[in-house]
Curated annotation (Swiss-Prot):
Residues given in the record as substrate binding sites: K163, S192, R249
Site (Important for acyl-CoA specificity): G111
Enzyme active site: C142 (acyl-thioester intermediate), H235 (proton acceptor), E237
Lineage: Bacteria, Pseudomonadati, Pseudomonadota, Gammaproteobacteria, Alteromonadales
Catalytically driven reaction(s): L-homoserine + succinyl-CoA = O-succinyl-L-homoserine + CoA
Name this protein carries in UniProt: Homoserine O-succinyltransferase
Compartments, as annotated in UniProt: Cytoplasm
GO CC annotation: cytoplasm
Gene: metAS
Length: 314
């Protein structure tokens, strides 16, 4: 949250140069406050686990967040009861005419399938297109990030010979950016995917900006220049045991997976994993919710045209 300071306080310029969020008394006095409305399209097999992971991150902010859960209406969930889906999830037709402050679209275990061959690809495209007019900011995670980059910008992913699984070092590619406030120069983040986007094509695209990257895992955080779409190529929401659970699942299925890198203590799968990404994962979602949702969204959700002062400086 911002530090409120007197108008024209000399420290303001210094703090802003250090990427510290300050707000003048005048702006603070005119700021309307209400709960943020966030929609989550949950494509992961274990709905309840993913709900919990995302709500844990959304709940770790000073903002009140009202959450709606969205499903693909004609896709049966094999790992979650129909009662749970009917009780807590909405079909797209129930939200089509609504506007939201934020939308999160999760990953999905579809990394080796061409986008057009995904059974519900048309529904994904429809929701992405809808979001560009009805949502202030969209956070795409892992597979959803690849899918949206393909659909919105025509960028293709490259399939990997072996699943990329582990916790990798990333670095900032820019210093003064609202989304990166509080980030260390280097930080850790988990990945679990069968494909990657070319770092070169992402950097070359005039409508995109790469904010963080890894020598091993490639691009991690990519933001559209209109600030509406944030593409995160990994899983900041993963809990400590998620990569371990996926590894043992793949072993049981005879897939001969590599041991997740930099994850188990001493890289020994017989030992417990070490979670070293939760702090930055929480900060990522908190910064997105604050700077790209709360500070940007209009008080009246019928009007989706508002911009923040820092946008004018980009």
């Amino acid at each position: 949250m911002p530090v409120k300071i007197p108008d024209d306080l000399p420290a303001a310029e210094i703090l802003e140069s250090e990427n510290i969020f300050v707000m003048s008394e005048t702006r603070a006095a005119n700021q309307d406050i209400r709960p943020m409305k966030v929609l989550i399209l949950n494509l992961m097999p274990n709905k309840i686990e993913t709900e919990t992971q995302l709500l844990r991150l959304l709940g770790n902010t000073p903002l009140q967040v009202d959450v709606d859960l969205l499903r693909i209406h004609d896709k049966e969930s094999k790992h979650t009861s129909i009662d749970h889906m009917n009780n807590f999830y909405r079909d797209f037709e129930a939200v089509r005419q609504k506007n939201y402050d934020g939308l999160i679209i999760t990953g999905a275990p579809l990394g080796q399938i061409e986008f057009e061959e995904v059974s519900y690809w048309d529904h994904i495209r429809e929701i992405i297109d809808w979001s560009q007019q009805h949502v202030t900011s969209v956070l795409f995670l892992c597979w959803a990030a690849h899918a949206a980059l393909f659909h919105l910008y025509g960028l293709n992913r490259n399939l990997l010979e072996q699943k990329r699984s582990g916790v990798f070092v990333h670095r900032r590619t820019t210093q003064h950016f609202p989304l990166l406030r509080g980030f260390d120069d280097e930080f850790l983040a988990p990945h679990s995917r069968f494909a990657e986007m070319s770092l070169e094509q992402l950097k070359a695209h005039p409508e995109l900006q790469v904010l963080t990257e890894s020598d091993t895992a490639g691009a991690y955080m990519v933001l559209s220049r209109n600030n509406r779409n944030l593409f995160v190529m990994g899983h900041p929401e993963y809990q400590k045991s998620t990569l371990k659970d996926e590894y043992h699942r793949d072993l049981e299925q005879g897939l001969n997976p590599d041991v997740p890198q930099n994850y188990f203590r001493d890289d020994n799968p017989e030992k417990e994993p070490v979670a070293r990404w939760h702090g930055h994962g929480s900060l990522l979602v908190s910064n997105w919710l604050n700077y790209y949702v709360y500070q940007l969204t209009p008080y009246n959700l019928d009007d989706m045209s508002g911009i923040t002062p820092w946008e004018n400086k980009q």
